[in-house]
Regions:
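FIC/Doc superfamily catalytic core
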Residues: 1-127
Length: 127
């Protein structure tokens, strides 16, 4: 069974990251935040739109990074929540901090799409 992040967890992660690394606190659009958190759970006709946990993680990251629900720290929050989501679901992440930074910037610039995000997450994970 998949363990999903709650809004409270995402808000806490965002608060801690901005407090520790700088930037402005705050939610810019609560609807975008709720949408980003809900996206990994999306279904159609009772079938998951994102069947694997890597697909769910990619959906979460893509939404948090690109929808800009926060005033600041969207990329930091997006990658941190993605890693936490995978860890909560039994995956060990093996990417280095420089790799995470480069990857997150590529996601933010829309240079890679959902299938490539999934593949990157799979290639940088261990079970």
């Amino acid at each position: 069974m998949t363990v999903y992040l709650t809004a409270e967890q995402v808000l806490f992660i965002h608060y801690r990251l901005v407090s520790e690394t700088g930037g402005e606190h705050g939610v810019r659009d609560i609807g975008l935040l709720e949408s980003a958190i809900a996206r990994p759970r999306a279904t159609f006709d009772r079938h998951d739109l994102y069947p694997s946990n890597f697909e769910k993680a990619a959906a979460l990251m893509e939404s948090l990074v690109n929808n800009h629900p926060f005033v600041d720290g969207n990329k930091r929050t997006g990658i941190a929540c993605t890693v936490l989501f995978l860890m909560q679901n039994g995956v060990t992440f093996s990417a280095t901090n420089p790799e995470l930074e480069t990857f997150t910037l590529r996601v933010a610039s829309s240079k890679i799409k959902h299938p490539q995000i999934v593949k990157w997450l799979e290639n940088h994970s261990r079970f």
